[in-house]
C-alpha cells in the first residue's frame, strides 16, 4: 500500500459516506443556481456576460463585497471541513496504526490524504462550474474563456490550499477537539479578523516608534503598503485579488476591494508600476505556499510524534 492507495481509499470513503455527493450537490446548487438566477432572471439579454457575476465586485468604502470573495469564504469552510479530521480521527480510532502496518510510511499517509481529500473538493468544485457552464449555454451568456478558465483553476488551487491547512492541523493535533478548535479559530481569523490584524500591525509599529527614541514612525505610504501586503498573506484575499486580475487587470484588481485610504495612497503608485510584492506572480506564489507549507509543517510534527 502506497500514497496512491491511501488516496484512492480516501476518495472511496468519501463516496461511501456521501460527503462527495453532498459537497457536489452544494456547489452545483450554489454556483449553477447563482448563474441561472443571475443570467436567467435578473439581467437582460444584452448584459449577459459571465464576468458580470464571476467578476462581480462592489466596494462600499468601509467594506467590499464580491462573488469570488463569497465563493472563497464558502470554499474555505468546506475545504477545512473535508480535511481537519483526516488523520486525527483515524489516530483516535486506532485505524491509523493498522494503516501504518500495511506497510505505509507516515509520508504515504499524509500525501495520500492530501491527494484524496483534494480530489473530493476539486470534483465538487468542477461539477459546480460545469453547472455554471450549462447555465451560460441555456441563457445565452457570453463567456471569455481566457478569464473564466483561469478563474476555475484558481478556485481549485484555493480549495487544495484549505485542504492542506486542515490536513496540517489534523496531522499536528493531539486530539479531535484540539483540531476542531484550531480549525474554527483559524477560519474565524481568515474570514473576519485578518484585515483588522493586518491594518493594526503597522499602527502598532508606529506606536512603538513614537515611544522609542531615535526611531522614526512609518510614512503613511509605507504603512499602507505593509498593511495591504499583510492582507495578501491571507489565502482568501490572495485568491480574491487574483480572480479580480483575470477580469480587470493587475492595477484595478489591487484596488477593487481596497479600503478608501488604500485606494488614495496606492492608486498613483500602481499607475507608475506594480511593486514586485504586489504582482500577480508573487501573489500566486503566496497561494501555492498555502498548498505546500501547512501540510509540510503538519507532517513534520506528525513524523516526530509517538503514536
Listing of model-derived features with the role each one plays in the protein:
Residues 1-31:
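Aromatic- and glycine-rich beta-strand/loop motifs that create alpha-glucan
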Residues 80-102, 114:
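Transmembrane helix boundary and interhelical loop/hinge segments in multi-pass membrane proteins
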Residues 62-89:
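Long, hydrophobic alpha-helical segments
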Residues 105-117:
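Membrane-interface alpha-helices at helix entry/exit sites of multi-pass transporters
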